[in-house]
């Protein structure tokens, strides 16, 4: 019986399970590999495109490798209250000793062997030091423009270069990349982005092999390896960059909090047949917000504006899209650019750009 600290394996499993897509049509995604070898306990999970492994030193010379149901193991381990948990094998079962004895079926392939997980290859180089806490903060802002559906596969990605860009048919987000990644060009899936955001990684290294599109993120106790770049050839980067550089005639500064408060109230009056539409009417000294049927009307005064020659400019936008893009902005003051552009309005906060498309009347 191999003994492991309960708290340690709880933390490891609670991280590892976040990588699983739990797709019943893809068996590996509902399983985890638990391996004890060379004095280390390692736990591995995958969504088939991204594989994650976390390890910790343990005081044993015994070795073991099993593959079991990840949700069952995680739920069980989280409910065990003994200081240590024991692991052993009995035929095709993993025996766990905690408050009692528990038997979990071991995953076996057609040849009768324990199921194999994707091999994680050692990074090709030393990697680039990355501040993942700051990177994920910026990804969370860009996430506000990731499509709600998975239909347009190429759009369900983040483009990372000098800027982190995300877009769907109605929204674009552009956030400056962290300095250590600005010279690289990466195209990562929304799933990998979600994994990085959910794991709460603060530091580590990044290695990218362009020939195989293999991205490896690693530190002393974990490694994430993913194949990236799928659908890059279909990604409309030039069109998105053109939208980001679009010119507008006017701009005005307003309070994000005031605008969000109004939108929260206005949302109560939005009906299904309104297509989530909300009218933003830019006037010389204020922004007027009204529902399509004008059952709600409120104004915000500009704190600063450049509106010479403006009479009035009306923009019908999706209220939910607008709220999502505003919610993630870190500060209160925003500059909205509008006018002489029948496609969109642009919201800027320092070096963050959020673009919301106009709806047809």
Q: Which stretches of residues belong to each language-model region?
A:
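Structural preference for solvent-exposed beta-strand-turn elements
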Residues: 1-361
């Amino acid at each position: 019986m191999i003994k492991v600290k309960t708290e340690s394996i709880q933390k490891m499993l609670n991280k590892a399970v976040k990588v699983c897509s739990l797709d019943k049509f893809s068996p590996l995604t509902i399983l985890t590999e638990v391996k004890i070898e060379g004095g280390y306990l390692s736990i591995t999970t995958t969504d088939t495109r991204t594989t994650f492994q976390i390890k910790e030193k343990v005081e044993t010379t015994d070795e073991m490798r099993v593959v079991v149901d990840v949700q069952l193991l995680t739920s069980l381990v989280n409910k065990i209250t003994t200081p240590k948990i024991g692991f052993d094998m009995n035929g095709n079962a993993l025996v766990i000793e905690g408050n009692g004895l528990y038997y979990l079926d071991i995953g076996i392939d057609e040849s009768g062997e324990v199921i194999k997980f994707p091999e994680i290859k050692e990074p090709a180089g030393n990697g680039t030091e990355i501040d993942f806490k700051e990177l994920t903060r910026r990804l969370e802002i860009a996430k506000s423009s990731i499509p709600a559906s998975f239909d347009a596969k190429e759009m369900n990605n983040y483009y990372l270069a000098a800027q982190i860009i995300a877009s769907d048919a109605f929204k674009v987000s552009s956030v400056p990349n962290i300095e250590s990644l600005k010279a690289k060009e990466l195209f990562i899936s929304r799933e990998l982005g979600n994994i990085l955001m959910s794991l709460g990684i603060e530091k580590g290294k990044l290695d990218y092999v362009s020939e195989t599109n293999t991205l490896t993120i690693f530190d002393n106790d974990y490694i994430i390896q993913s194949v990236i770049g799928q659908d890059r050839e279909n990604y409309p980067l030039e069109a998105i960059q053109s939208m980001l550089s679009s010119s507008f005639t006017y701009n005005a500064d307003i309070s994000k909090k005031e605008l969000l408060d109004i939108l929260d109230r206005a949302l109560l009056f939005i009906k299904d047949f309104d297509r989530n539409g909300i009218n933003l009417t830019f006037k010389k000294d204020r922004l007027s917000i009204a529902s399509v049927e004008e059952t709600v009307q409120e104004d915000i005064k500009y704190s600063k504006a450049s509106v010479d020659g403006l009479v009035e400019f009306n923009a019908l936008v999706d209220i939910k899209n607008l709220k999502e893009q505003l919610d993630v902005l870190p500060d209160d003051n925003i500059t909205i650019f509008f006018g002489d552009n029948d496609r969109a309005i642009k919201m800027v906060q320092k070096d963050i750009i959020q673009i919301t498309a106009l709806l047809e009347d």
